[in-house]
Each structure stands twice: as C-alpha cells, then as structure tokens.
C-alpha cells in the first residue's frame, strides 16, 4: 500500500517542483504555467474567494459587510505558488461591522444603502499549507 502512495507523491511533487523557475540574475520567479481557466466550483477557488472576501471586508472602510453574490470567472497561474485571478460580484449586506456571529446577513434591501460591486481578486495560495495572500484587488460599481 505504501508503494502506490509513494509513487503518486513522486509523480505529484516532481512536476510541481519543476513548474517554478527562478531567474537568479533578476531574483524573480517566472511563471511556468500561465493563466488558464479553472472551474469556479473548484475547492481551491472557493477557499480563495472566501479569503479574498474576508480581506476585502477587513480593509473596507464601509460600515457594512459585503457578501458574495456570485463568482463569475476564475483562472490559475502557477509560479512559486498557485495564483488565482477571480472575478466576482458582491453586494453590501444588512450586517454592520464588526460581525456578530448570531446575525444572518443578507443583501441590503434599503435602496439608499444598496450597493453592488464587480471585483477582481488575485490570490496567491499554497492551499495545502493553508497559506493565502491577497496580492491585488480591484472593484468597480455595477
């Protein structure tokens, strides 16, 4: 039972290790696999969206939390980590910051407070280590 496990680990680790190329003269990491589409239902994409939303709400000066309406598109690039470029639509909720865990947040119904945004997040991840970094975010009113 250990041989098949060992072989599968070898076949996974070696290509992953070869996927990254560091240019020592420029001290930069080159992408070995450029952005390609990935399913929005992928577990890593969902983790990255959750992380990006948490970071967005933490950094936002809005008095209300924003909720994910839908994930529109996701792409993946492999460098020294996995980089997910994710396009989402989010909306202001009825929950004020800081969140009380007993609240059930729903999108804002008050027309004066309603707000929808289209956002692009770039999340660097080593999901197997639980490491996530929000590399960039850009949001525009819808």
From Swiss-Prot:
UniProt superkingdom: Eukaryota
Disulfide links within the chain: 95-105, 119-139
Position of the signal peptide: 1-19
Annotated glycosylation sites: 100
GO MF annotations, alphabetized: cysteine-type endopeptidase inhibitor activity
InterPro entries per UniProt: Cystatin_dom (IPR000010), Cystatin_sf (IPR046350), Sperm_Mat_Cystatin (IPR052691)
Keywords on record: Disulfide bond, Glycoprotein, Protease inhibitor, Secreted, Signal, Thiol protease inhibitor
Gene Ontology CC terms: cell surface; cytoplasm; extracellular region
Function, as annotated: Performs a specialized role during sperm development and maturation.
Protein family per UniProt: Belongs to the cystatin family.
Protein's name according to its UniProt entry: Cystatin-8
Organism: Rattus norvegicus (Rat)
């Amino acid at each position: 039972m250990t041989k098949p496990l060992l072989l599968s680990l070898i076949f996974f680790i070696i290509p992953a290790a070869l996927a990254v190329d560091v240019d020592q003269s420029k001290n930069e990491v080159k992408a070995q696999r450029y952005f390609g589409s990935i399913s929005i239902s992928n577990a890593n994409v969902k983790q990255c969206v959750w992380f990006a939303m948490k970071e967005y709400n933490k950094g936002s000066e809005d008095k209300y939390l924003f909720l994910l309406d839908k994930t529109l598109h996701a792409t993946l690039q492999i460098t020294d980590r996995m980089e997910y470029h994710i396009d989402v639509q989010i909306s202001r909720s009825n929950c004020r910051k800081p969140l009380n865990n007993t609240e059930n947040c729903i999108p804002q119904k008050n027309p004066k407070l309603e707000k929808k945004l289209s956002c692009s997040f770039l999340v660097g991840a080593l999901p197997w280590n639980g490491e996530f970094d929000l590399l960039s975010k850009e949001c525009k009113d819808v």
